[in-house]
UniProtKB/Swiss-Prot annotation:
Cofactor(s) the record lists: Mg(2+)
Similarity comment text for this entry: Belongs to the tubulin family.
The protein's name: Tubulin beta chain
Sites where the protein binds GTP: 11, 69, 138, 142-144, 204, 226
Pfam families xrefs: Tubulin, Tubulin_C
Extra information: Tamoxifen used to treat breast cancer blocks the interaction between apicortin and, alpha-tubulin 1 and beta-tubulin resulting in microtubule destabilization.
Subunit structure: Dimer of alpha and beta chains. A typical microtubule is a hollow water-filled tube with an outer diameter of 25 nm and an inner diameter of 15 nM. Alpha-beta heterodimers associate head-to-tail to form protofilaments running lengthwise along the microtubule wall with the beta-tubulin subunit facing the microtubule plus end conferring a structural polarity. Microtubules usually have 13 protofilaments but different protofilament numbers can be found in some organisms and specialized cells. Interacts with DCX/apicortin; the interaction stabilizes microtubule assembly.
Positions of transmembrane segments: none
GO biological process entries: microtubule cytoskeleton organization; mitotic cell cycle
Biased composition, class Acidic residues, residue ranges: 429-445
One GO molecular-function entry: metal ion binding
Binding site for Mg(2+): 69
Length: 445
């Protein structure tokens, strides 16, 4: 079947990854020891998308965990699903990357990369028909960003025709964990533009906002944030894992969402999100889901889709519902808010319907959108990058690992090119290329 190899890099990647495996195992009825204890044949029918079956009917995740320091991995191993993973698939160094992209990409990471690639090959060889790779990592630190992008480019060399999908946590606008985040993120984006097929952009601040505003949690933990991300991640692959009326997979997603090869940075969202207290006051219907899914407050990255236009969008519905209703709702959204969709791609939304909803819900939907508003994110990081780079602040940490200033300049201009490409397509009209119209004001949905 269509297998996916999952890789998690660095602290953030491993924490999201650990949560993701909890969610997926729950959906497939697999307990922390790897034994199946579910109640439906459908759970096992395509369990091999994410799991290998070992002797004695034990299911082992097709996951590779890597980090440059053992700390996070030890906590994953000690966590609720720690015994699920194959011990050989933990690959870690001892030194740490110290939030330094150059350490992750050129020095420390480069020493460990061969060990990781061996495990990747082993997992890929165990697949009948490998669909692609999914990587969870952050772009602000050293390992996930530096070593993560190194691994992506190595895998790209070896498996050029397989889909490479990443879930990348971008630096947040107001909350900063590390001073050198803008450097690490810009250098990473420089790599992701060239080597990844689809990048789902996530950021912590937007996730915190969802937890405060929508879920009404007073003190959200990283566990809560990661749970949100995992719900969306599981939705992206649900059509591969469960039967449905309208299927989608990573390649279909890419074909339908990427009009131009460089513009593959997506916003993701998930619905329904309700606080514990207000659940009984809402009915779950397709219109309700569609409404919430296109809501700006629902996006998992801090860009407001109302500030740009959707080039394309994709909705993956889960649960028992009529496809006719889904199509009507999607058409409805496009007709009512036509100014938010570029008019030179007619019918630019794709939908898929999968019969099995997530645990504990009757219906749900995962939203993936390619909006030009994502440029806000890049612009923000780029401005911070320029401010520091102009003074050459912190640069010695990178040049000391053998990097060249030229690389920074290249990464910066690549990021700025990306921003202007998004802007160009936001302004483009259907009638005449090169003739830019004035943009209308903000319209509420």
């Amino acid at each position: 079947m269509r297998e996916i190899v999952h890789i998690q890099a660095g602290q953030c990647g491993n924490q999201i990854g650990a949560k993701f495996w909890e969610v997926i195992s729950d959906e497939h009825g697999i307990d922390p020891s790897g034994t199946y204890c579910g109640d439906s044949d459908l759970q096992l029918e395509r369990v091999d998308v994410f799991y290998n079956e070992a002797t004695g009917g034990r299911y082992v995740p097709r996951a590779i965990l890597m980090d440059l320091e053992p700390g996070t991995m030890d906590s994953v191993r000690a966590g609720p699903f720690g015994q699920l993973f194959r011990p050989d698939n933990f690959v870690f160094g001892q030194t740490g990357a110290g939030n330094n992209w150059a350490k992750g990409h050129y020095t420390e990471g480069a020493e460990l990369i061969d060990a990781v690639l061996d495990v990747v090959r082993k997992e890929a060889e165990g697949c009948d028909c490998l669909q692609g790779f999914q990587i969870t990592h952050s772009l602000g630190g050293g390992t996930g960003s530096g070593m993560g992008t190194l691994l992506i480019s190595k895998i790209r060399e070896e498996y050029p025709d397989r889909i490479m999908e990443t879930f990348s946590v971008f630096p947040s606008p107001k909350v900063s964990d590390t001073v050198v985040e803008p450097y690490n993120a810009t250098l990473s984006v420089h790599q992701l533009v060239e080597n990844a097929d689809e990048v789902q952009v996530i950021d912590n601040e937007a996730l915190y906002d969802i937890c405060f505003r929508t879920l009404k949690l007073t003190t959200p933990t990283y566990g809560d944030l990661n749970h949100l991300v995992s719900a969306a991640m599981s939705g992206v692959t649900c059509s591969l894992r469960f039967p449905g009326q309208l299927n989608s997979d990573l390649r279909k997603l890419a074909v339908n969402l990427i009009p131009f090869p460089r513009l593959h940075f997506f916003m993701i969202g998930f619905a329904p999100l309700t606080s514990r207290g207000s659940q009984q006051y809402r009915a779950l219907t397709v219109p309700e889901l569609t409404q919430q899914m296109f809501d700006a407050k629902n996006m998992m990255c801090a860009s407001d889709p109302r500030h740009g236009r959707y080039l394309t969008a994709c909705a993956m519905f889960r649960g028992r519902m009529s496809t006719k209703e889904v199509d009507e709702q999607m058409l409805n959204v496009q007709n009512k808010n036509s100014s938010y969709f570029v008019e030179w791609i007619p019918h630019n939304t794709k939908s898929s319907v999968c019969d099995i909803p997530p645990k504990g819900l009757k219906m749900a939907v995962t939203f993936v959108g390619n909006s030009t508003a994502i440029q806000e994110m890049f612009k923000r990081v780029s401005d911070q990058f320029t401010a520091m780079f102009r003074r050459k602040a912190f640069l010695h940490w990178y040049t000391g690992e053998g990097m060249d200033e030229m690389e920074f300049t290249e990464a910066e201009s690549n990021m700025n090119d990306l921003v202007s490409e998004y802007q160009q397509y936001q302004d483009a009209t259907a009638e005449e290329e090169g003739e830019f119209e004035e943009e209308e004001g903000d319209v509420e949905a």
